[in-house]
Design a protein with these regions (language model features):
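Short Gly/Ser/Thr- and charged-rich N-terminal loops/segments
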Residues: 224-228, 232
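Residues forming the flavin
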Residues: 2-51, 55-146, 150-167, 171-221, ...
Length: 556
């Protein structure tokens, strides 16, 4: 017999399956042999903290090994090909969905596989430099593989988020992510899951090419209107029939390959060379809002005390505390982003002359610090205020009427370079005590930090653009009043957080998912401006795969 129950219980009863079973026996008189947690969330609004659970209790029978039907893949070795550029979550989920639909994915990834990539990340601290093709942004798994593995998304409108979580579980993630209100795999476990997804792609006839960088799209300018799928958008007789790519051999880009087929473009939000190529080729893009700011790091026990209303912090039974903060300052949103409880701050640059920070947490979330991005909203209409960040010469000559829409990208680059200069041209990060940042003074010394390459004292309040620093300072003051102890000299402001999302959107039709002027090109995921995190990128990847399948299978 299976009982489904809604429980509101103390943390010590909700700690694990055995403690829940003990609670059911002692408090409910249900002699369950096993339980399945369907939903789990923590209510810490009052001093007495409760855990809300929806559980299935199994009495006299065993629970199934998987709580969903596993997804079935079939051999596609001899099926028509679709090129997937990028092996982040958008690209990987697109590839798996293509296999389900009977098409062969050819995945082209500029970076290395997830194991080799980890070695390059480890070299950042001792060498104080970043490999431009293998870093926290580029490589198998994309930016999400080594930046926390959070699977929480507010978007429920664009696709089936449960499918994404189930596919992760099928490839080795814990089934707990199906129940948690804020599911999280962890940077220590997600790479193995990503590797298993690649193995599935290869096992069923797909291809994966690492250290292979797209350098151009192959465009057929002949008319498409004589046959095939009727065009509902202005493709001007142009369609994508493949890509040109170069292969890295012995540390040099040398061998040039062509891959033929329609293209799912899932290159991520840091592939700036792709944005410039599209603009120079007259392939329409437009400005998109994003947010820029800093990473704020507190001692984890302090955040636990604040969020759990208890001097003892989280104690034995609770996880490291999370927070989510948002306010408006002079008409623009200021908010926390990618909060990493019990985590650490990492160097997230993807090229030379850059210092960028991000955050991550291992699955246990048991580190000494907790950190979060603290960012200020920038809207497309704010672009005129950024006129002191001129475009590079290469953009002045581009054919696209949207060339000005690369201006926010230039703002990112200029701020990242300024951060690098402040860091003495190394991967150390400019930093300031939180109270000094708010008061407008240089810190005489700095707190300990999880940031491995090291910190250097810097007046971020001075060199950050005023429309960012002023809003952050006002928000910090407000949140310090709302959460006693939050505004403290024990916290550290670390620069700079610029990679919250893509600075542009690659324009596509909402129904066909194809670019508005070129058939056979499917802009996808966070880099194209249609997702914001692992799960939403995975959902968008699946939608693009379905659209690409419709396009391929309907053509003569």
């Amino acid at each position: 017999m299976v009982h489904e129950l809604n429980l509101r219980i103390l943390p010590q009863w909700a700690y694990n399956e055995q403690s829940i079973i003990a609670y059911l026996r002692q408090e409910k008189g249900i002699n369950a042999g096993a339980v399945r947690v369907l939903r789990r969330s923590i209510d810490a609004r009052q001093r007495t903290i409760y855990v809300n659970l929806t559980v299935q209790a199994y009495v006299g029978e065993e629970p199934p090994q998987l709580y969903f039907e596993p997804y079935i893949y079939k051999d596609v070795s001899d099926r028509p090909s679709v090129i997937v550029v990028g092996a982040g979550p958008g690209g990987l989920f697109a590839a798996l969905r293509l296999i389900e639909l009977g098409l062969k994915p050819i995945v082209v990834e500029r970076g290395k596989d997830v194991r080799e990539r980890k070695k390059d990340l480890a070299r950042i601290r001792p060498e104080q430099r970043v490999d431009p093709e293998s870093n926290y942004s580029f490589g198998e798994g994309g930016a999400g593989a080594y930046s926390d593995g959070k699977l929480y998304t507010r978007s429920k409108k664009r696709g089936n988020t449960d499918r994404i979580l189930q596919i992760f579980v099928q490839h080795g993630a814990s089934q707990a992510i199906l129940a948690d209100a804020h599911p999280h795999i962890g940077t220590d476990r997600l790479p193995r899951v990503i590797e298993n997804m690649r193995k599935t792609i290869l096992a069923y006839g797909g291809e994966v090419h690492f250290q292979t960088k797209m350098t151009g799209l192959i465009i057929d300018h002949s008319s498409l209107r004589s046959g095939g799928t009727p065009l509902t958008i202005d493709h001007c007789g142009k369609r994508i029939i493949g890509i040109v790519a170069k292969k890295m051999v012995n540390g040099q880009w040398s061998i040039v390959n062509e891959f033929k087929g329609p293209v799912i473009l899932a290159t991520g939000h840091s592939a700036r060379d792709v944005y410039r190529y599209l603009a120079a080729s007259g392939i329409d893009i437009e400005a998109k809002g994003l947010a820029i700011g800093v990473r704020l790091e507190h001692p984890a026990h302090l955040i636990d005390q604040i969020q759990y209303h208890c001097r003892e912090g989280r104690g034995r039974w609770l996880p490291a505390a999370e927070y989510s903060l948002v306010t408006q300052v002079q008409g623009r949103g200021v908010y926390s982003f990618c909060m990493c409880p019990g985590g650490f701050v990492v160097p997230a640059a993807s090229g030379p002359e850059q210092v960028v920070v991000n955050g991550m947490s291992p699955s246990g979330r048991n580190g000494r610090w907790s950190n979060s991005g603290m960012v200020v909203e920038i809207r497309p209409e704010d672009l005129q205020a950024l006129s002191n960040f001129p475009s590079k010469g290469e953009e002045k000559d581009c054919k696209s009427p949207f060339k000005e829409d690369l201006r926010v990208l230039r703002l990112q680059e200029e701020l990242e370079r300024q951060c690098w200069l402040q860091a003495n041209r190394l991967q150390t990060a400019p930093a300031q005590r939180m109270t000094d940042f708010v008061s407008g003074r240089l810190s005489a010394d700095l707190n300990e930090s999880s940031y491995a390459p090291g910190l250097i004292a810097s007046p971020l309040h001075f060199w950050l653009p005023d429309f960012i620093s002023m809003r952050l300072r006002e928000a910090f003051k407000l949140w310090g009043k709302q959460k006693r102890g939050f505004l403290t000299s024990e916290a550290t402001v670390i620069g700079i957080e610029t990679r919250t999302s893509s600075p542009v959107r690659i324009l596509r039709d909402s129904e066909t998912m194809q670019h508005i002027r070129i058939a056979g090109l499917f802009p996808c995921g966070e880099g194209a401006g249609y997702a914001g995190g692992i799960v939403s990128a995975g959902v968008d990847g699946e939608r693009c795969a379905e659209a690409a399948a419709t396009y391929v299978l309907s053509r003569p």
